[in-house]
Amino acid sequence: MPHIIFLTFLYVGGKKLETIKKNEVKTGKVIDLTHEGHGVVKVDRYPIFIPNALIDEEIKFKLIKVKKNFAIGKLIEVISESDDRVTPPCIYYAKCGGCQLQHMTYRAQLDMKREQVVNLFHRKGPFENTVIKETIGMVNPWRYRNKSQIPVGQSNSNQVIMGFYRQRSHDIIDMDSCLIQDRQHQEVMNRVKYWLNELNISIYNEKTKTGLIRHLVVRTGYHTDEMMVIFVTNGATFKQSELLVNKLKKEFPNITSIKQNINNSHSNVIMGRQSMTLYGKDKIEDQLSEVIYHISDLSFYQINSSQTEKLYQQALNYAQLTGKEIVLDTYCGIGTIGLYMAPLAKHVYGVEVVPQAIKDAEDNATKNQLKNTTFECGKAEDVILTWKSQGIKPDVVMVDPPRKGCDETFLTTLLKLNPKRIVYISCNPSTQQRDAQILAEQYELVEITPVDMFPQTTHIETVALFVRKDEE
């Protein structure tokens, strides 16, 4: 039976130029990077995306996927290297999906992330005059994660494996180190891996939906060094929990909380809704500036504490608080940014849809004796209209939504509220740009500052200042 070869014919201006076929080896010069950090080579204007390639490099690559409008290539050889290329320090980098940019100098990473924001805002929508600052980076862009979520599995020989997922899969790469995790977290991971094997504790199997241990989660207070260890289990029965607790307490004296989180769902969601404390406190503490925060196993808290302080300080600079302003903190979570601003504001109102987060925010306000704060549970668009009817008129609104961005209903309600300034923090500049087009009806997008919260990855966070047009 003859081999079937699939060809893609390239057409430019109706003229057929060249054929591209899967498994073909080609050479070319990288002219750009995608938002995922992949190098772009063009053959007669047809784009080919090659991971781990850098701009201006001459490379040899193999075509591994060919589509009508693009192809994916695999880097075989770098014929001429970019000055921005470095040797990745992590031995798992070629396989692990956790990092995408370790082959790039840190300076080049910061430049690439700013360029992403420039491409989004200067080339689409009415934002060509918006100032986009240099990316705020880290002095040491390693070991920055204060939370590690580590999947647990078993090898073919029934040995416990722990690490992170292979690129674009749920295959666990067994690891004993990770250069972006807190060093203590990898030490806990390695000891727990040994004990799970030693005690013959059953491990969850994604295919059969059986077994007990699904994930190990470790959280650390960056400024307090308090540590929380969480066993995510497929069910409540955890007979050997006491043995594990005693081993952890003995070996890691700074552990102040050990918890079990129950996740019976057959999904990719890591944590379930029910938790119980096996040892110590229900929460750990961390501190940003002068504010102390209580953090539970389910709390949303920024992963990179040192960069969070820079992010919030930039937001504070944009807010221009003098002590006379009413601040509205939407999507407030456990109150992190609202409480950070409270010492410099007249009053801070926070709204969040998650009841436990509001309780945590109130507890954090009490802990810090910040009496000029009010937190309420509900949809932001509903609660802020209630506050408006009560005569509460904010001068500054803080917006920090999830990756999907803001609901359009919320944005139209925000326009009715008409504050002087809006400070919008985003973990997804694409949805921030979409939302900015709605706000542009009444607001000038004055400035955006990218902040590198996740070095060695393609992720970028931004903080943007919107000023009401009659205030300019």
PLM regions: where:
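Hydrophobic beta-strand signal
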Residues: 60-62, 149, 328
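Short, acidic/hydrophobic/Gly-rich beta-strand patch recurrent on exposed beta strands
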Residues: 39-44, 163-166, 230-232, 361
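Short, conserved phosphate/pyrophosphate- and ester-handling motifs at nucleotide-, phospho-/glycolipid
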Residues: 56, 181, 304
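Rossmann-like S-adenosyl-L-methionine
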Residues: 2-26, 35, 240-472
